[in-house]
Amino acid sequence: MKRIGVLTSGGDSPGMNAAVRAVVRKAIYHNVEVYGIYNGYSGLINGKIEKLEIGSVGDIIHRGGTKLYTARCPEFKTVEGREKGIENLKKFGIEGLVVIGGDGSFMGAKKLTELGFPCVGVPGTIDNDIPGTDFTIGFDTALNTVIDAIDKIRDTATSHERTYVVEVMGRHAGDIALWSGLAGGAESILIPEADYDMDEIIARLRRGHERGKKHSIIIVAEGVGSGVEFGKRIEEETSLETRVSVLGHIQRGGSPSAFDRVLASRLGAYAVELLLEGKGGRCVGIQSNELVHHDILDILDKKHTVDQNMYRLSQELSI
């Protein structure tokens, strides 16, 4: 294999640039040419492809977002769209593709694999919801962004003796909520993977207030429901002054943490190794700090699960 491509797809995550950098530099180290595909699968269809050199990825390891840009691409879900994408890959002489993104991006890589084009997926999403890896690129940075926000919210919550509901990202996965809630000392954590008892949450807030607690923090993953609605109900049933903070897209931005930069560098380089070994249709990950790879079809068939021991601990510590 003498020429490979790389693209970023779906929602951006901090560390994607570090992964792109690793792909480019690792490939060039092995005398393999690298082509960047801009705007994800949309750029693949539209032919927005250009050769990348070492200088192309200079000064990006510390930058959030993605140099290659990203976009949703409904057209790629069609057979015609995918065939057009492969046609463009062949036009540039590209023999393998590294896809950096989440489960939707992996689905695109799966479709290309089924058409006979070798792809390797690199998990890049702040949600940490890709099976087969302990961590995804961007999760640690997003987690630290949320923790920083919680710490600041706690300051004002204490000053005004208020209860705060903090809504974080996670439509189907509660890792951001769970990890940030545990690290931030939240009184309650609501995640999509676990049932919750609103009456118990209310009772817990009342108990805290009765023993002189000056503030409370409730973390809600967006997939559970609206933080605003939770805030209204809490205030109505407890008479505690309650405010809601929806963190939104700030969780996706910012300079990647050291952990995410190292993770992205390791996974990006490993993806290139697999392609050069002729192993397409794979996705890479890290488990117990060891690099691993899986059949991308198997990963897409699995469902993300939350760490039940960690969730249980969060419940035990929020008495």
From Swiss-Prot:
Reaction(s) catalysed by this chain's protein: beta-D-fructose 6-phosphate + ATP = beta-D-fructose 1,6-bisphosphate + ADP + H(+)
Active site (record annotation): 127 (proton acceptor)
Cofactor requirement: Mg(2+)
Binding-site positions, ATP: 11, 72-73, 102-105
GO biological process: one example: fructose 1,6-bisphosphate metabolic process
Binding site for Mg(2+): 103
InterPro entries referenced in this protein's UniProt entry, alphabetically: ATP_PFK, ATP_PFK_prok-type, PFKA_ATP_prok, Phosphofructokinase_CS, Phosphofructokinase_dom, PKF_sf
Reported regulation of activity: Allosterically activated by ADP and other diphosphonucleosides, and allosterically inhibited by phosphoenolpyruvate.
Annotated pathway: Carbohydrate degradation; glycolysis; D-glyceraldehyde 3-phosphate and glycerone phosphate from D-glucose: step 3/4
Protein residues bound to substrate: 125-127, 162, 169-171, 222, 243, 249-252
GO (cellular component) term, any one: 6-phosphofructokinase complex
Gene3D superfamilies: 3.40.50.450, Phosphofructokinase domain
Record: residues binding ADP: 21-25, 154, 185-187, 211, 213-215
Compartments, as annotated in UniProt: Cytoplasm
GO molecular function: 6-phosphofructokinase activity; AMP binding; ATP binding; fructose-6-phosphate binding; identical protein binding; metal ion binding; monosaccharide binding
Keywords: Allosteric enzyme, ATP-binding, Cytoplasm, Glycolysis, Kinase, Magnesium, Metal-binding, Nucleotide-binding, Transferase
Enzyme type, top EC level: transferase
EC number assigned by the record: 2.7.1.11
Assigned protein family: Belongs to the phosphofructokinase type A (PFKA) family. ATP-dependent PFK group I subfamily. Prokaryotic clade 'B1' sub-subfamily.
UniProt subunit comment: Homotetramer.
Function statement: Catalyzes the phosphorylation of D-fructose 6-phosphate to fructose 1,6-bisphosphate by ATP, the first committing step of glycolysis.
This protein's name: ATP-dependent 6-phosphofructokinase
Encoding gene per record: pfkA
